[in-house]
Curated annotation (Swiss-Prot):
Family according to the record: Belongs to the amidase family. GatA subfamily.
Gene name, Swiss-Prot/TrEMBL: gatA
Class of the enzyme per the UniProt entry, highest EC level: ligase
Subunit structure as annotated in this protein's UniProt entry: Heterotrimer of A, B and C subunits.
Annotated active site: K77 (charge relay system), S152 (charge relay system), S176 (acyl-ester intermediate)
Record flagged with keyword Ligase: yes
Protein's organism: Streptococcus suis (strain 05ZYH33)
Stated name of the protein: Glutamyl-tRNA(Gln) amidotransferase subunit A
UniProt entry tagged with the keyword Zinc-finger: no
Amino acid sequence: MTFNNKTIDELHDLLVKKEISAVELTKATLEDIKSREGAVDAFLTITEDAALAQAAALDEKGIDADNVMAGIPLAVKDNISTKGILTTAASKMLYNYEPIFDATSVAQAYAKDMIIVGKTNMDEFAMGGSNENSAFKPTKNAWDQTKVPGGSSGGSAAAVASGQVRLSLGSDTGGSIRQPAAFNGIVGMKPTYGTVSRFGLIAFGSSLDQIGPFSQTVKENAQLLNVISGHDVKDATSTINEIADFTSKIGQDIKGMKIALPKEYMGEGIDPQVKETILKAAKHLESLGAIIEEVSLPHSKYGVAVYYIIASSEASSNLQRFDGIRYGFRAEDATNLDEIYVKTRSQGFGEEVKRRIMLGTFSLSSGYYDAYFKKAGQVRTLIIQDFEKVFADYDLILGPTAPTVAFGLDTLNHDPVAMYLADLLTIPVNLAGLPGLSIPAGFVEGLPVGLQLIGPKYSEETIYQVAAAFEATTDYHKQQPVIFGGAN
């Protein structure tokens, strides 16, 4: 028996009516995970015993009819801390690390009686766009197992797209939720910076990182964001997002809404078929009453360069804590303190992580700080100002989530610059701290294309409103890969 084709609302109705139990739903989910895992390799840890025990306790307590998330299984990216459950960030450096606390987002999920069924694969320390930088294994795309699932939250995206779970958590530093969502044909939201607490998220770029939800549908995405959002005193960058219910505008029409289409998002480097798909999506939104107009974000072309200086510099600082002394991997052949540091970090970090640490350390070093890190911060301000100018006249921005559909395994992982450029459409959103959502908008040669909707800070309600209107009048979200039982 499987329930992976039912929405959260439908599952909740079954649970409340006691037509299924939380244990039955959890067992069915675990079976879905096991039956598909060999094909997609989405999980690093499956928490079968703990999940079943949690579900049994919930059945004994009873399902609260007002708590739509009670008993719903959830997969969690492996850089989000889970008490007593391996949290490796897909790195040899943390191969045996079990946190003694839960991330705030995980604690919030537990508080709503969600059932955590496992930890998902990712690029090591969230550095990568293909999931091939995992120290343990590459995850495969749900639609075509010869393609990448995107990164860094590729495991979380593939788990939802393949029908292993309905919902998962990821993190997004430069596109790591939206790009995998696009590549796998599902919904992925990077909320406004500060909307979801970063407490318990293993830090990569502290001014950029944000936890967010993956789902099959727009409403389910908003429902999960309701769970994990909220101000947290444990996170100094946590903000108060006044939106009480992210689902509140879903179902409202979008007539008269002004949506901008930046010419830079449809120019050089964008696959012509992806561009055609997005223009078709824009026409569809026009047919629903939205007003689509071309605008310019002139400094977005510098986004990738700015991002890789700022993110790598922050990573260089954040990853200093992994030294072989306190926890995690320690080199066995070290004979003194200096060797412990050098050999542990040389052996424990993967090539991409070491590349970014070196890049960041260089950017912060004496004599180069002004030329690189300071200048990157100044251009970041210009990128923010570009967005502010557009949002003075428009409700949202739309464009492709990624310049191409999912590419083949072992094609870009030896070309770091090409891999970095794959994030050129998502990175500016992180630099500006804005919310961005990717939704399925079509297919190119059998692979999903993602439509990205970007709004001003704290506009998640409006983004979900437009996304839901698009979803309700198209069937892209209903199409499923073969592994999920679909015909594609």
